[in-house]
C-alpha cells in the first residue's frame, strides 16, 4: 500500500504573520489607518488631536499604498513606461490621494475613502489570521467581517461618491480660504485616474448614474427652464472634462 502523505501542520498566528511579512506590514498599517480615521471622525480627544489623527491616517495609508505598489511593480525603473504603468494601479492613485490631502484642511469627506478601503482590505487578511487561530475562533469578529464583505459593493459605491463630491469640495475650500490654489487642479488629476481605473469601475459607473438621474429630473415639466438649462450646460461641461478612450 502506498504511503499516504499527511497534510502539512497548520501555522500558528505568529508563524503565519512572520511568514508573510509584507502582507502583515500592510495589514498592520491598514488597521492603524482605521484606528486613526475613527479617532478623527469621532473626536473624543478634542479638535487638535483629531487633526493629528487625520494626518496620521493619510500617512499610514500612503505607506500601505507604497507597499502595495511595490508588491504590484517590484522592479522600479526610472522611465516613462514604468510611470505610465504605475499610474494605472489603484495603489498609486491612493498614494497620490494621501499626499495631496495630508496637509490640507481636514474634512470628514476626504477621510472616508481611506478609512473604508483600509477596512475592506484588512478584512481579507484578518480572516486568514483568524483561520490560523482555529476554524471556530472569535465567531463574533468573523460574523462582522462577513457582513462587511456582503456589503462590499455598496461600500465601494459610497467611496466613489466621496471621490466625486470631494472635487467641488476642494473648490469650495479654495474660496473659503481653507485650501490652496493648486488643490482643485491636482485633485482633478486624481479623479481622472479613478475614472479610468481598470480594477475599480465604480467612479466611472457612478458618474454615469448621476448624469442619467439628473437628466431625468430636469426633463420633468415641473422643472424651471433656467434650472434645466443650467444643469444641462453643467453636464455638458463635466462630460468634456472626462477622459476619452475609456
Task: Name these PLM-found stretches.
Residues 3, 8-246:
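Multipass alpha-helical transmembrane domains of eukaryotic endomembrane proteins
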Amino acid at each position: 500500500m502506498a504511503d499516504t502523505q499527511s497534510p502539512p501542520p497548520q501555522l500558528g498566528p505568529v508563524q503565519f504573520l512572520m511568514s508573510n511579512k509584507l502582507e502583515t506590514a500592510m495589514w498592520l498599517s491598514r488597521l492603524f489607518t482605521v484606528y486613526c480615521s475613527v479617532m478623527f471622525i469621532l473626536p473624543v480627544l478634542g479638535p487638535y488631536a483629531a487633526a493629528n489623527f487625520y494626518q496620521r491616517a493619510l500617512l499610514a495609508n500612503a505607506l500601505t499604498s507604497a507597499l502595495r505598489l511595490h508588491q504590484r511593480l517590484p522592479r522600479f525603473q526610472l522611465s516613462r513606461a514604468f510611470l505610465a504603468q504605475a499610474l494605472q494601479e489603484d495603489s498609486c492613485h491612493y498614494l497620490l490621494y494621501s499626499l495631496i490631502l495630508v496637509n490640507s484642511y481636514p474634512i470628514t469627506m476626504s477621510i472616508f475613502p481611506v478609512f473604508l478601503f483600509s477596512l475592506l482590505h484588512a478584512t481579507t487578511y484578518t480572516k486568514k489570521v483568524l483561520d490560523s487561530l482555529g476554524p471556530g475562533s472569535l465567531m463574533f469578529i468573523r460574523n462582522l467581517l462577513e457582513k462587511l464583505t456582503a456589503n462590499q459593493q455598496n461600500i465601494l459605491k459610497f467611496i466613489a461618491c466621496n471621490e466625486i463630491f470631494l472635487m467641488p469640495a476642494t473648490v469650495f475650500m479654495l474660496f473659503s480660504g481653507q485650501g490652496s490654489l493648486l488643490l482643485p487642479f491636482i485633485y482633478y488629476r486624481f479623479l481622472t485616474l479613478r475614472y479610468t481605473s481598470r480594477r475599480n469601475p465604480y467612479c466611472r459607473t457612478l458618474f454615469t448614474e448621476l448624469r442619467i438621474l439628473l437628466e431625468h429630473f430636469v426633463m420633468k415639466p415641473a422643472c424651471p427652464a433656467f434650472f434645466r438649462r443650467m444643469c444641462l450646460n453643467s453636464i455638458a461641461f463635466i462630460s468634456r472634462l472626462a477622459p476619452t478612450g475609456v
